[in-house]
């Protein structure tokens, strides 16, 4: 099986807390160093651990904690042409009830990666942190760093207080469009901080239950973004759903199209099928890819939406349920493989093809 190039849309580095603290003004610095850094996570027990136990160097250092280690032990090993760095510690701060502290952390984390990580390797690209608990402050941060070299995206948590189609978030989308940046959401903070319960039914009892149900927040945000007219007001906006799976999309759009035909008076700004809007503006990453007992079922799902334009490979490194490039590529037919593994991401993030020696 030949993979001509690999662009990874979801990699999770972890910055040194001391380097973040250096960029925080008081009183935030002292508070950050004391360990109070935002709502965190629900901490359901995962018997595998969240981070892969084998993602360590020969000296026992975590690979995701160093730009040099990440380049050597992941990018070099899998021959990654580009990787989008989505720092995992920026998600929880977006659900803090204290927007000023959250905005300060976002700025500090962004500066660590822009000043220390991106210069370390030309293959690194970065999703800037934007804490949506105060959209105006988030928009200010996007305008501050959105034009910096290596910045390709704005990242927000999929856990949220209200759906992202509501007009309170328009300042974020306006700032992103000004800089030509897609906006992405990522799971993991559903149910923490100022977000609502992680499922429509309330709080689950186990990691298995919580993790399986994370797709619910993606569905809710997508319906909201489309029906509340975000892509009508911001026709240049692109939106990326990271780590939400794939196969739920076609049946959701069938239902949404059907309901729109009967209820279009409730969304008078929509003048075409919701599915057409989604196909034009929305992208999904592959991990965690569905694995049915009969692989042909997955391939049939790929025929039900424009996967060649919407799907981008993601490893989710170094998390426990990550997918390697070779594993992912095997799941896609030859005619689709290059689009998923690199071409769609290259076009979305405007990444020049690197010379290969």
What annotation goes with each model-predicted range?
Residues 2-7, 18-82, 111-115, 119, ...:
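Mid-to-C-terminal alpha-helical segments outside catalytic/metal-binding sites
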Residues 12, 160, 188-189, 226, ...:
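Catalytic metal-binding/acid-base residues of hydrolase active sites
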Residues 14-15, 91-93, 163, 192-193, ...:
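Flexible loop/turn segments at secondary-structure boundaries
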Residues 79-221, 228, 355:
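Active-site gating/metal-coordination segments in enzymes
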Residues 149-152, 177-182, 234-237, 279-283, ...:
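Glycine-enriched alpha-helix->loop->beta-strand junction motifs that scaffold or abut catalytic
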Residues 183, 187-191, 226-281:
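Aromatic-lined glycan-binding groove of carbohydrate-active enzymes
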